[in-house]
């Protein structure tokens, strides 16, 4: 249970071939953020990018939320910042990434894909999310963003590094 939401995930690949890194963190008692990174497309730099994301992502997101009047984050601005930091860290490569933010009280899910495929199922709707261009490919981040109101959802995410299913229901 994270931020009063029941969260489950299931890797849908062999355990000896890890490739998708999933990180989920509570930002407050009402909201959480997550990302899924495919570490297989950039050699050893994929693992380094995962460590860099782990160290920076939640802090950048919390800083952004603290400095804006609106309740929902600007994931596009955040991903541009992450793309810039990957370049500053001199980490060449492609970093397919899906980023998500969920606010329990607003029942609002935001998903942004930069190179990973995803299908979102809310029970009422099933939406295919365009995979877009992986981070690190271009000098800027180009976004495929989806915003959906829901109190429960499943997201199947896949790329070169494998496939996983992430499920959430608000309590």
What are these regions, as identified by a protein language model?
Residues 1-152, 156:
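… and, occasionally, acidic/histidine-rich disordered N-termini of signaling adaptors
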Residues 146-149, 166-170:
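Activation on terminal intrinsically disordered regulatory regions flanking enzyme cores
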Residues 159-167:
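Short acidic/polar inter-strand loop motif in beta-rich domains
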């Amino acid at each position: 249970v994270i931020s009063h939401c029941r969260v489950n995930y299931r890797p849908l690949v062999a355990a000896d071939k890890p490739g998708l890194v999933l990180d989920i963190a509570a930002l407050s008692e009402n909201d959480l953020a997550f990302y899924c990174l495919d570490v297989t497309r950039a050699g050893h730099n994929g693992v380094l990018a995962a460590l860099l994301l782990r160290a920076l992502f939640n802090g950048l997101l919390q800083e952004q939320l603290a400095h804006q009047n609106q309740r929902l984050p600007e994931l596009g601005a955040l991903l541009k910042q992450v793309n810039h930091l990957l370049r500053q860290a001199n980490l060449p490569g492609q970093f397919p990434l899906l980023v998500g933010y969920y606010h329990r009280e607003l029942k609002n899910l935001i998903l942004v894909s930069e190179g990973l495929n995803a299908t979102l199922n809310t029970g009422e709707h099933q939406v295919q999310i365009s995979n877009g261009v992986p981070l690190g490919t271009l000098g800027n981040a180009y976004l495929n963003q989806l915003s959906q109101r829901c109190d429960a959802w499943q997201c199947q995410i896949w790329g070169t590094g494998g496939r996983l299913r992430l499920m959430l229901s608000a309590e």
